[in-house]
Amino acid sequence: MKLTCVMIVAVLFLTAWTFVTADSIRALEDLFAKAPDEMENSGASPLNERDCRPVGQYCGIPYEHNWRCCSQLCAIICVS
């Protein structure tokens, strides 16, 4: 009985939350519609840059094309 009441309250809360946030979503719809080449400063996106480690730092399991190393070559430490 308690679980049923909790589930009903949770569903009502999530439904109300959806309706409350729906108005604010309409104001932001243009932000996601733009392609990266249409944006003013698409090069400044943090997703365009990877945080790589310089030569001599620990990189983990050794293998070629390791994204952790700037040189993409890992032998427990990044090598050039």
From Swiss-Prot:
Disulfide bonds join C52-C70, C59-C74, C69-C78. Transmembrane segments: none annotated. GO terms for cellular component: extracellular region; host cell presynaptic membrane. Expressed by the venom duct. Its main location: secreted. It is found in: Secreted. Residues 23-50 form a propeptide. It holds the Pfam family Conotoxin. Keywords: Calcium channel impairing toxin, Disulfide bond, Ion channel impairing toxin, Knottin, Neurotoxin, Presynaptic neurotoxin, Secreted, Signal, Toxin, Voltage-gated calcium channel impairing toxin. One of its GO terms (molecular function) is calcium channel regulator activity. Residues 1-22 form the signal peptide. Omega-conotoxins act at presynaptic membranes, they bind and block voltage-gated calcium channels (Cav). Belongs to the conotoxin O1 superfamily. The presence of a 'disulfide through disulfide knot' structurally defines this protein as a knottin. This is Omega-conotoxin-like PuIA.
